[in-house]
Amino acid sequence: MSIPTNTPKFTRNELNVFRLPSDVSKVTGALRGVGRNIALVPTMGALHAGHKELIRRAKRLPNTIVAVSIFVNPLQFGEGEDFEAYPRTLDHDLATLQELGVELAFTPETVDLYGESGVAVTLDPGPLGAELEGEMRPGHFGGMLTVVAKLLNIVRPHYAFFGEKDYQQLVLVKRMVEDLNMDTRIIGVPTVRCDDGLALSSRNAYLSEEDRERAAVLSTALGMGANAGAHGADAVLEAARAELAAHPEIKIEYLELRGTDLGPAPVDGEARLLIAARLGSTRLIDNTPVLLGASALGSDGDDGGDAGHETHDDATGDGPHAAPAGATPSQQGYQRES
C-alpha cells in the first residue's frame, strides 16, 4: 500500500493515534485512495464490552480499516448533567483498542473540533429530538448530531457503528445521514448485557452496590412487556408497568412503546419499548424490540414465540436474532458481556 508522502504516518497492523482532524482526514483519504474501506466507531471513551462488540462487528468487514473516535462531547450535556464527572480513561481505552487490533484512534480535544470560540452552527434534530430523551435532556440530540456530523465529515467512513442501547440516537443518526445525503451506512448493533440483563453503560459505574442489584429490573420489565406483544400495545405497557410497580424505589421518567422509527406503534408488526429511570442519582436508559399483534404469533400460533425479535441493520451477514418465548432482554439474542 502506497500512502502519499504528505500524509501523516500510518502503520498497518498497529494502533495509530491522531488528535488533529486534518491529520485524520488526510490518512483516511489516503486509505480510501488505495482501495480501503473505513469503518468508524464513535465513542466517548470509558470503553466496555458494548464498545468492544461494536469494534468486533466493524472488524468483520473485509478490506476495512477500523477507526475509533474518543471524545466526550460537551454539546450533548445539559446544565447540571455529568459532563465533568463523566469517566475519562484514555490510556486504558487506547490499550483496549490495541488489544482489539484497531488501527486508527481519533482523540481530539474540544478545541480541535469546535475551535477557540466554540461552534456557531449546530444541527436541529427535528420534532423527534424533543421527545423521549429529548424531553428529559433539552439540547442533547442537537449536540449529539452536530458532533456525529463532524466526525463523519472528518473521517468520511463507508460505515459507522452505533449500539442499539441508545436507540433514539441511532434513529436520529440514520435520519440525519438520509436527510443530508451523507455517504455513510449506519449500522445498529444489539445491546450488550450483563448476565442479569442490565444493559452495559459507562454510567453503570455510578451505581451503588444496592442500586446495581435493583437495576436489572429495567430489563426484566422490558422483557415482560415484549412477551405480551401478541395481546397488543396496551398489554405490553401493562405488563412492563406491573413489574416496575413492585420497585417504587426506581423512579421512572418514561416508559413508551413506539414504532421502530419512533413514530406511533403499529397495531401489528415491529415496535420498540423504551424506558428511562433513575436509581439514586444515576439515570439509566434501555429498550427492547417488540412484535405486536399477529406478528408476535409463532408459526404454530402460540403466543409470543418470537417476542423481542431483533430487526437491527447488520452489515456483517449475521442476520436477525430471535428470542425464545418468555425471554427477557438478556435472552433475546442480545450479545452477552465478555
Language-model regions: role of each:
Residues 266-271:
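A short, glycine/Asx- and small/polar-enriched loop/turn
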Residues 274-279, 288-291:
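Short beta-strand elements
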Residues 261:
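Basic, glycine-rich polyanion-binding accessory segments appended to enzymes
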